[in-house]
């Protein structure tokens, strides 16, 4: 199932809002996909629309140890092992099914936590410091 241009733009706008709210994040194209980086270096989210004809609107995110296998097995209609980065534990999150955006925000934050340095995690955990 491919998403309409309006659906893709709406989903990307929500992902941008979530990802760019995290400390020192940037967005740029990487491998032709909107991607989000910590300090413009480490990728923590890739946004894909119909990657190589897979028919999915999805995020690929860095996932905590064990999460990829658990979610891809328990909820294959929503989560999957993405190509190229799946062997490193990354998780595919479908955005073309019933999406819980609060859950997506938590997943994006978890991904950020996988790649961000401790100084930025401290900003995230203790913003008043």
Report each predicted region and the residues it spans.
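Charge-dense, helix-prone N-terminal extensions
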Residues: 1-129
